[in-house]
Structures are given as C-alpha cells and as structure tokens.
Amino acid sequence: MGHSACSFQMPTLPSLTGSIDTKEGLETCFVLSYYARVRLVYNLLPLLRQSPRPRVLSVLNGGKEKALHEQDIGLDQRWSPTAVINHTTTMTSLAFEHLAKENKEMTFLHSFPGLVRTDIFARLEPPESSGVVWRVTLAFIRGLVAILMLCVGMPVEECGERQAFLLTTDRYGPGAWRIDASSEQVITPGVLERYREEGWRERNWEHTMRVFDTALAIGSESVSK
C-alpha cells in the first residue's frame, strides 16, 4: 500500500439559533468539527497502519485550545457557540495526542488555517425570532468580516496549498502536531500542559468512544424499526 493521508477540511460555524441536534442527539457543529472526523480516522486506522507513511490532517483550530467545561465535555448542559468551538478544538488536540501515543508510526496534524476568503460568515443567518437590533448587528459583523477577509484574508488556493504541504512535507514526522496559519508548529502548550498531566488525553478518548457506542446503538435501533 502506498502513501496514505486523510484530510478533513469542513468549515463549520455553530448555529446562532441554538443547538441543532442529529437523530443521535449530538449537536451538529460538534459532530462535523470533532466526532465525525475522529470516527473516520478511527475507522481508517487498520488501513493507515499498513501504509509506510500514514498522515492525518484535521483543518480546524490547532494552537487555539481553551479550557473545557470538565464536568460537561459533551456540552449537554452548557452548550453555546463559543463552548462548541473551544471544546472541539481542545478535544481534537487531545484525541490526536492519544492516537499518536497508540500509533507511534503515524503523523497527526491539527492545523489552524487562519482567516480564509470564503463565504462562511456571509451565510450566517439570525434566528427568526431576532429583533431589529440583532439583525442589524449581525449584518454589520458580516460586513466587517468581509472587509477583513478582503484586506488580510488568505486566498482559498493558498490555504489549500498549505494543507497539501502539511500532508506531504517531511518536516512533521510521526507524532501529534499543532500547526498555525503560517504552517509552523505551535510550541506553547497552553491548557494542554495541565490536561496532559491530569490524564485528559485518555479521559477525552474514553468519552469519545462512549459517544460513538451510544450513537451506533441509536442508529441500530432506528434501522431495526
């Protein structure tokens, strides 16, 4: 088997209308940004282990890890757009460090692409119940972001080239890496230092496996009905 690489580049933003759940009871943005990506990697591990140069890349928010709500890491009780971003970011880095520890021949890359010139913010819509002030505020934010993207945003083509570089370069060997918008390693551990010491790589992985088991059980029940 030749060179293997998994790249996930699914830009997502949390809903402004509140938590929108899948049929398994999981919040949609959480699924797209974390659970679905990790599940795909998990399912592909047997193939990746046969590759001479296995590499996994998740384009999300590497290096921007924040503290978790440690008693509610699935955000069943404390969901908010900011919490989803923070949790999926930190949990991705913890999951990749766990996977790298268990698969010492693999490279796991969690990258932050920076501000890229896409229409992701332009597609933000206010809740139907929003008042005039919130609608005007959101329109202002969309306009401001559009200007920022035009002035300092990275072209989509360059962003794609940078991610392709990460998948093919020899700079980042086996292990778990956090990569910034300049395609450089993020060295400062931030909140990860404490989480490593407290065993959160394993605790996060155990939580993730429980979520998978529950989701698969619900899916099986739906199919059998």
Predicted segment positions?
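Rossmann-fold NAD(P)H-dependent dehydrogenase/reductase core
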Residues: 1-126
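NAD(P)H-dependent oxidoreductase Rossmann-fold/reductase module
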Residues: 69-225
